[in-house]
Amino acid sequence: SSAASDVYKRQTALLCGMALAASGLMLQTTFNNPLADPSILGISSGASLGVALVMLAGAGTITAGVFTLSGFLSVIIGAFIGSMLVMGIILFFSTLIKNSIMLLIIGIMIGYITSSAISLLNFFSTAEGVHSYMIWGMGNFGGVSLQQLPFFSLVTMAGLLITILLIKPLNALLLGTRYAENLGINIRRTRNLLLVATGLLTATTTAFCGPISFIGLAVPHIARLMLGTSNHNSLLPVTMLTGGAIALLCNFICILPGEAGIIPLNAVTPVIGAPIIIYVIVNQRKIQYFN
């Protein structure tokens, strides 16, 4: 029934928002960069390439939202491998390049490379493959069926749990890597755990709901502006809750047309996210986030 599917959608939106916001916060802290997030660093596009390979090359007949279990698992695995690969590349470059702006540019370049690969896959794919990929790419919280919801919830909760366990190392990273090492934090292990958690959360949300932009980028800033602190003890839970709330708001806007159809999610998130980012950039001198 539509009432039941609305409940699943809300639950998916809540978890998705929490996952993307937590990923954005972790990346901003890890790279000490207020403009880091899964979509800008190319992690979402890595996941999208994984999905495209499965949807368009593997079996052009997989349609968005009605994956069989094996097809749907392969989509998740594809997304996870894609996002982890990009995270690995970014981490590799982060050891070579200390300038965080340059790192963002590398992420954007990776995004361009993956989107050109996706364009090629679209060119050689079947019409229904392209159509299902296009629909998926618009973003939709309705992509998780009742059968898939327990799996989706479990994986997302596991990723969020890892982030909560990383609060202490994240706080240490804020003060700089040298200081964190003096506190006895294993930087490499922390970064690897952050890599896995962010990869897991980004891959799961991207595989199910499409590449959703701006939630991961904007929400940590909203939370910081509300709290006036960068301490992850309070910042991480508030970021998660705000992410969930904003995703629910976006979901509400998406379903406003009712019978006329659903507004694509990626038509709504930038409208909310972009003004916040512009505000943060304009007032960056006043807002002291990072050390």
Task: Identify the residue ranges that each predicted region occupies.
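Alpha-helical transmembrane segments in inner-membrane proteins
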Residues: S5-N291
